[in-house]
Amino acid sequence: MKLMALQLLLWHIALWMVPEAAPLSPASSLPQSFLLKCLEQVRKIQADGAELQERLCATHKLCHPQELVLLGHSLGLPQASLSSCSSQALQLTGCLNQLHGGLVLYQGLLQALAGISPELAPALDILQLDVTDLATNIWLQMEDLRMAPASLPTQGTVPTFTSAFQRRAGGVLVVSQLQSFLELAYRVLRYLAEP
């Protein structure tokens, strides 16, 4: 039941962000093989994230949407945007920059969760590696197309969790936000992969 409530919250967040997921113009000059690989990676990360979410919910009982909303405000976790991916006139460079920057943000947030619990560490490590791999692939493609900025983006300010409870609550929130971000990213990549 708690997992269903969490999934409902994720869908609510995704629906709230739907204006950002408006149809894109067909302006993609990205290789099909790159797009298909990214789609596969996003689905793998989503599966890893769902597994970690279930374990966090089962282990720490922090899955009620009301708790998540309150905790989200108190922890002040940053969220990634894909606004350059949603305009009627797609900004491919801006979209790829935002995809990459969002993944870098979530890399940092996942790193901040280190030490959440010994049982969850392997699942967290896998999720972090998969996010890093996707971010690297996007960056390399941007370099190949000469779209990459002069320097790699930084992770920015990552919250410091001062207690085990905050780290566990942050884990639930970070994974939830990552799942919402990935759902939008998947829609963008799927659209770009269409002939």
Swiss-Prot record:
Monomer. GO terms for cellular component: extracellular space. Coiled coil: none annotated. The gene is CSF3. It is found in: Secreted. Belongs to the IL-6 superfamily. Keywords: Cytokine, Disulfide bond, Glycoprotein, Growth factor, Secreted, Signal. One of its GO terms (molecular function) is growth factor activity. This is Granulocyte colony-stimulating factor. The keyword Signal applies. Pfam families: GCSF (PF16647). Granulocyte/macrophage colony-stimulating factors are cytokines that act in hematopoiesis by controlling the production, differentiation, and function of 2 related white cell populations of the blood, the granulocytes and the monocytes-macrophages. This CSF induces granulocytes. Disulfide bonds join C57-C63, C85-C95. O-glycosylated.
